């Protein structure tokens, strides 16, 4: 399963606004080419497949159905046999490219499927795959593609989401696992039903690397337990999406993840240095494969990342495009909940109790007194039993989140806070974990 290709930027087609005529601009694609387009800020673009067959990140398009993409969307419509599509609406850029790594990605899928068939035959477990690389090389897209191709063949792979900044499964600041049972919806992505979600509390692993590694191990244990009782999940294996921090402690976190999940395959996108380091440091039986990134991958600004995070939280409360769900606002008494932050502030080693290290403080539960500074913070509702001993850190750290709320107002005199919740009162549990992430509800 080797894949080393130097990308050449051979692009055909002119940039188009996609606004000519009532039916939009038509693009006729030859086989094994893709139409790439980006949607302008504040705009929406409609795509329609007119003839032939095409897919977006491994999800097949239906003919004569109009798909709508919101502001900032970056889409690639690929065809294996050739097709005709129409675009209507304002695009920032729209062009057809012959130069795509899709054949390499398909070959990767074929090799993984061969491993699944062998696992079925030998009554072994299927491939556990980790996708790594720096930021903005298309890791999430490759994961989505490989999962879609697997599930289209009737497999039941698991997506493990370790990107705490740009999670595709839950709100930012979480680490999660999701069993994939059907291909991703072209517009909405994967159906997120009954994911396993752990609270991390920040958008960067570096804020608490010990907690990050601990939760990685917790997800690996949970996945292994599921594989023991579910043969289809075991054969389907997992695809692990990682974050783009690949140096120092970030690199060590990748090595830890490979060990915790006992990965068989590591796909390295667009960085030879990382490829060679992993080849050197991982066990010899782990296949490390270097793959090129797509020429359509776009670098995202900090503002773009923040907007994406806000949209993900908004989607959690209001549904896709803010139309499907109706969240509830209600008051919660301070006395009814226990609020904690994971990780105590760093203090000089000389001030620590005898025998205690800085690492120990990273997993410490610090009680938070409700006050006005809690306003707009996202809180995880821990699934830990309310009868658990107050401050029992291990139970709270290792318990998944059963949901999330946002504090919209705090009344210190009345000793209550108003929260936005996806479900009506009362809260299912009363142990809350505070995130560094804020969300201002403008609805």
From Swiss-Prot:
Residues 1-11 have a biased composition (Basic and acidic residues). The keyword Metal-binding does not apply. It comes from the Eukaryota. GO terms for biological process: brain development; cerebellar cortex development; mRNA 3'-end processing; RISC complex assembly; spinal cord motor neuron differentiation; tRNA splicing, via endonucleolytic cleavage and ligation. ATP binds at residues 34, 74. Its main location: nucleus. Residues 13-24 have a biased composition (Low complexity). It catalyses: a 5'-end dephospho-2'-deoxyribonucleoside-DNA + ATP = a 5'-end 5'-phospho-2'-deoxyribonucleoside-DNA + ADP + H(+); a 5'-end dephospho-ribonucleoside-RNA + ATP = a 5'-end 5'-phospho-ribonucleoside-RNA + ADP + H(+). It is found in: Nucleus. The keyword Calcium does not apply. Belongs to the Clp1 family. Clp1 subfamily. Polynucleotide kinase that can phosphorylate the 5'-hydroxyl groups of double-stranded RNA (dsRNA), single-stranded RNA (ssRNA), double stranded DNA (dsDNA) and double-stranded DNA:RNA hybrids. dsRNA is phosphorylated more efficiently than dsDNA, and the RNA component of a DNA:RNA hybrid is phosphorylated more efficiently than the DNA component. Plays a role in both tRNA splicing and mRNA 3'-end formation. This is Polyribonucleotide 5'-hydroxyl-kinase Clp1.
